[in-house]
């Protein structure tokens, strides 16, 4: 398991920055690849928001395991623009169309 919380946090930051444009990953996949327990997926947003240069982290590329995206009213317009620019289409329920082919698993 994890040696230190700081090491886990740094791994999450590093992995999040590797998600390529036009692809998404899930909170659970990100946590798993960083060596954390699945229940830690709930902490990802907080961990990422505390990263140095957190504006370099593509928050919009991290989604729920169902393919649904969270569109916070504060960032909705910006995120919808980013999805469009990256060729990621959403259905009327804010789920990624063709989610399985857009899913990035770090493999």
Predicted regions and their residues:
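Nucleic acid-binding interface residues in structured DNA/RNA-binding domains
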Residues: 1-107
């Amino acid at each position: 398991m994890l040696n230190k919380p700081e090491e886990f946090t740094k791994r999450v930051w590093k992995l999040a920055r590797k998600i390529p444009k036009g692809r998404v990953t899930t909170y659970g996949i990100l946590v798993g690849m960083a060596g954390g327990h699945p229940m830690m997926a709930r902490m990802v947003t907080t961990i990422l928001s505390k990263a140095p240069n957190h504006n370099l982290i593509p928050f919009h590329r991290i989604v729920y395991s169902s393919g649904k995206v969270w569109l916070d009213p504060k960032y909705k317009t910006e995120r919808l623009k980013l999805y469009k620019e990256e060729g990621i289409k959403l259905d009327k329920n804010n789920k990624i169309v063709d989610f399985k082919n857009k899913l990035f698993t770090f493999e």
